Amino acid sequence: MANTLEQLKSYTTIVADTGDIEAIKRYQPEDATTNPSLILKAAQIPEYRALIDNAIAWAKLQSADIEQQIDDASDKLAVNIGVEILKLVPGRISTEVDARLSFDKEKSIAKAHKLVRLYQEAGVDKSRILIKLASTWEGICAAKELEQEGINCNLTLLFSFAQARACAEAGVYLISPFVGRILDWYKNDTGKDYDAVNDPGVVSVTEIYNYYKQHGYNTVVMGASFRNIGEIIELAGCDRLTIGPSLLEELANSQVAIQPKLLPASTTVAAGEPLTEAQFRWDFNQDPMAVDKLAEGIRNFAIDQGKLEVMLKAKLAN
């Protein structure tokens, strides 16, 4: 019998949630996703030294201003890592817009344009890139404009149905609902343990998936942020699942037989009127878990972006 990972690949597109090229070679995913935390982690890998050196040298040629150099080096490093990953995956790379821009639509769009330009200068067409944006109202509005320009987006830090609905109504290419972080919040809040079937993160993604399919939305649902393989197995059949190296290894070493749990609707019905900004903000605010986890996620990505910039600043000074 095929291992659990190989079985899963027959129902769901598997995406590697890592910037580690060796892990990507090992598990042969379709796509890969990165974020500021993963770029920071990848920057510590000795094999990536040349990519960092290249980003530093390039940034120095763009500007004499140190703050601009840091910004340029950070963007160039993320793209350099993405370019290397794209040599190994047949699909797409997700590269994230600076989390500190999560509440600024125009600056998010400008950063997305810059990342796409850097990829194109490296010979990568925009059809192989997903721009990652936080699922704030401003991020969703930025994604709507980018999608209309033909730049596909991955809306991340998604914890609520309101966020998912707004993304679909904006015509976003893909969303990343965070399964494990939802579970973390509920375990902390209730003190209870949850089996995979009743896992609040699994329940949330299942609801979103079913809503999208019932209403004929094309937005791809990519479950993310897993805590155990039970969550992953319960979401077999989801459009995509992005999984970190340790859980990919556990799936590859497992012989559990799996069946698809999520299935597309046989018929579709028209959706209602799109959410207004006021409705979105109210519905989102009614979910304390989502409010907490979105804010925390943005803060933590911003912290790791800051750590990366400290490292780059030291290298730029040499």
UniProtKB/Swiss-Prot annotation:
CDD domains cross-referenced by the UniProt entry: Transaldolase_TalAB (cd00957)
EC annotation from Swiss-Prot or TrEMBL: 2.2.1.2
Catalytic activity: D-sedoheptulose 7-phosphate + D-glyceraldehyde 3-phosphate = D-erythrose 4-phosphate + beta-D-fructose 6-phosphate
Keywords for this protein: Cytoplasm, Pentose shunt, Schiff base, Transferase
Record: active site: 132 (schiff-base intermediate with substrate)
Annotated GO CC locations: cytosol
A GO term, aspect molecular function: transaldolase activity
GO BP of this protein: carbohydrate metabolic process; pentose-phosphate shunt
Location(s) in or outside the cell: Cytoplasm
Superkingdom of this protein's organism: Bacteria
Pathway(s) it belongs to: Carbohydrate degradation; pentose phosphate pathway; D-glyceraldehyde 3-phosphate and beta-D-fructose 6-phosphate from D-ribose 5-phosphate and D-xylulose 5-phosphate (non-oxidative stage): step 2/3
PROSITE patterns for the chain: TRANSALDOLASE_1 (PS01054), TRANSALDOLASE_2 (PS00958)
Top-rank EC class of the record's enzyme: transferase
Keyword match Cytoplasm: yes
Function: Transaldolase is important for the balance of metabolites in the pentose-phosphate pathway.
Subunit details: Homodimer.
PANTHER family membership: TRANSALDOLASE
Family, as annotated: Belongs to the transaldolase family. Type 1 subfamily.
Protein name, per record: Transaldolase
Gene: tal
